[in-house]
Swiss-Prot record:
Modification note: Hydroxylation on proline residues within the sequence motif, GXPG, is most likely to be 4-hydroxy as this fits the requirement for 4-hydroxylation in vertebrates.
Highest rank taxon of the organism: Eukaryota
Annotated segments matching region Disordered: 43-113
Major subcellular site: secreted
Protein localization: Secreted
Record's protein name: Mannose-binding protein C
Protein purpose: Calcium-dependent lectin involved in innate immune defense. Binds mannose, fucose and N-acetylglucosamine on different microorganisms and activates the lectin complement pathway. Binds to late apoptotic cells, as well as to apoptotic blebs and to necrotic cells, but not to early apoptotic cells, facilitating their uptake by macrophages.
Species, as recorded: Gorilla gorilla gorilla (Western lowland gorilla)
Keyword annotations of the record: Calcium, Coiled coil, Collagen, Complement activation lectin pathway, Complement pathway, Disulfide bond, Hydroxylation, Immunity, Innate immunity, Lectin, Mannose-binding, Repeat, Secreted, Signal
Record gene name: MBL2
Basic and acidic residues bias (residue ranges): 49-61, 93-102
One cellular component term from this protein's GO annotations in UniProt: serine-type endopeptidase complex
Domains (record comment): The coiled-coil domain mediates trimerization.
Signal peptide location: 1-20
Domain Collagen-like: 42-99
Length: 248
């Protein structure tokens, strides 16, 4: 049997195999549907080389790292404003009455009584030697002669006021106390002719001498108690006996 008659057929098979690698199955069917049939897909090749780095992406959110150690305490800050007062608490229960030794109580009462007795004796001595008492007033003089302003200062120093009779009994007590003319706590310095006491109250009792007050020297703003018990207006700058009154 000769090989030559099959040679054309072998060449045709090689050409068909080579052509099938360069065309798709669909194209081959279109060109030669009756001669060549499509073969199965070939084996995958090796992976290609890595491509170039892409563009830099946007910054991501910070990740949750490990919690660090607790730091040292900071400096003490300034004190805050005081808060509002709290509501009052409930009322407590009534306590038991206190007890004091009977000896201390009786001793205090005894000392108080002795002191009161001594004060009463001193008051009598003062009344007998230097002063006069009428009702709840005690009139006292130190025998000094001075201006009206100094008399006021002297009486205030001893928590008293310049003697101011409110009735005939007080006026007579002051008259019996003095041996010479004395200032009274009465003036018309603010309003001429309107005599008031040192607190600004108008007088409810007067005992002016005949023809007084007359403001003879145009500056007679103070009042004297004369030896006869009557009153006379005089300048406050003159000097006369100081008499103070003490409430008791």
């Amino acid at each position: 049997m000769s090989l030559f008659p099959s040679l054309p057929l072998l060449l045709l098979s090689m050409v068909a195999a080579s052509y099938s690698e360069t065309v798709t199955c669909e194209d081959a069917q279109k060109t030669c549907p009756a001669v060549i049939a499509c073969s199965s897909p070939g084996i995958n090749g090796f992976p290609g080389k890595d491509g170039r780095d892409g563009t830099k992406g946007e910054k991501g959110e910070p990740g949750q790292g490990l919690r660090g150690l607790q730091g040292p305490p900071g400096k003490l800050g300034p004190p805050g404003n005081p808060g509002p007062s709290g509501s009052p608490g409930p009322k407590g229960q009534k306590g038991d009455p206190g007890k004091s030794p009977d000896g201390d109580s009786s001793l205090a009462a005894s000392e108080r009584k002795a002191l009161q007795t001594e004060m009463a004796r001193i008051k009598k001595w003062l009344t007998f030697s230097l002063g006069k008492q009428v009702g709840n007033k005690f009139f006292l003089t130190n025998g000094e002669i001075m201006t009206f302003e100094k008399v006021k200062a002297l009486c205030v120093k001893f928590q008293a006021s310049v003697a101011t009779p409110r009735n005939a009994a007080e006026n007579g007590a002051i008259r019996n106390l003095i041996k010479e003319e004395a200032f009274l706590g009465i003036t018309d310095e603010k309003t001429e002719g309107q005599f008031v006491d040192l607190t600004g109250n108008r007088l409810t009792y007067t005992n002016w001498n005949e023809g007084e007050p007359n403001n003879a020297g145009s500056d007679e703003d103070c009042v004297l108690l004369l030896k006869n018990g009557q009153w006379n207006d005089v300048p406050c700058s003159t000097s006369h006996l100081a008499v103070c009154e003490f409430p008791i």
